[in-house]
Amino acid sequence: MTALLSPDQLEADLRAIGARLYHDQHPFHALLHHGKLNRGQVQAWALNRFEYQRCIPLKDAAILARMEDPALRRIWRQRILDHDGNSPSDGGIARWLHLTDALGLPRELVESGRALLPGTRFAVQAYLHFVREKSLLEAIASSLTELFAPNIIGQRVAGMLQHYDFVSPEALAYFEHRLTEAPRDSDFALDYVKQHADTIEKQQLVKAALHFKCSVLWAQLDALHVAYVSPGVVWPDAFVPERDSKRAAA
C-alpha cells in the first residue's frame, strides 16, 4: 500500500522523475549540444521551440486566473513578465525571436506558426489544456521541469557556442536570463507542492503532473528527430530548410 510521503521524500521522488524523463536525455539534444546538427536542423529546432515559448505566458496566465490569493498572484505574475516583457523588445519571447533572427529565419514565418510540425503543435496544446483543466496544484506541479533546466541550459550554451560558428553569445541571451529565472520559479513551485500535496492522492497527482510535462517536452523532440534527423519524414506544410532558406533570401 502506498504511504504518505514526507515533503522531502516527495521532493526526492519528483527529482527522480526528472532524472529519468527530462528531455536532456533525448537523443536530439545530444546531437544539438555536440555540434552534430547542420544549420537547417538547428533552424527547425528554434522555429518549433518558439511555439512552446509563445505559449508559456498563456499557460501562466491560465494558472494565474485560478489563484484566489493575491499574494500568490503577485508571485506568479512575474513569470508572465519574464516572457512577455514590458515592451515588444523585452522579455523571453523577444529574446527567442532574436535567436531565430540570428539563425536566418524570417520572423513572419516563425511568428505565424504555419511551418510547425504537427507534433509540436499538439504537444503544446496538450500542455495548455492540462493547466486549464487540472487542479491548481497539478498545474503548478507541471512547471517543476524547471528544476532541471539550469543543467541543460549550461550544456546547450556551451555546446552551441563551441560547435556552431553561426551562433553567438548575443543570440543565446534567452538562456542566460533563464539561468536565474528558472531556479527562482522552481524553488517557489517546489515549496508550494511540498506544502499542499498533503495526502497520498495529491502526491500521486503531482508526480503524474511532472511525468506528463516531461512527456510534453519529450514529444516535441521526438517530432523534430523524426522529421529532421531520422527517418527524415517532414510534414508537407512544415519547415523545410532548403526551400524556406531560399524563400528567406528572395
Swiss-Prot record:
UniProt-listed Enzyme Commission number(s): 1.3.3.11
GO biological-process terms attached to the record: pyrroloquinoline quinone biosynthetic process; sulfur compound metabolic process
One term of GO molecular function: pyrroloquinoline-quinone synthase activity
Catalytic activity: 6-(2-amino-2-carboxyethyl)-7,8-dioxo-1,2,3,4,7,8-hexahydroquinoline-2,4-dicarboxylate + 3 O2 = pyrroloquinoline quinone + 2 H2O2 + 2 H2O + H(+)
Any Pfam family: TENA_THI-4
Pathway the protein contributes to: Cofactor biosynthesis; pyrroloquinoline quinone biosynthesis
Keywords: Oxidoreductase, PQQ biosynthesis
Cysteines paired by S-S bonds: none
Family to which this protein belongs: Belongs to the PqqC family.
NCBIfam families per record: PQQ_syn_pqqC (TIGR02111)
Protein task: Ring cyclization and eight-electron oxidation of 3a-(2-amino-2-carboxyethyl)-4,5-dioxo-4,5,6,7,8,9-hexahydroquinoline-7,9-dicarboxylic-acid to PQQ.
Protein name: Pyrroloquinoline-quinone synthase
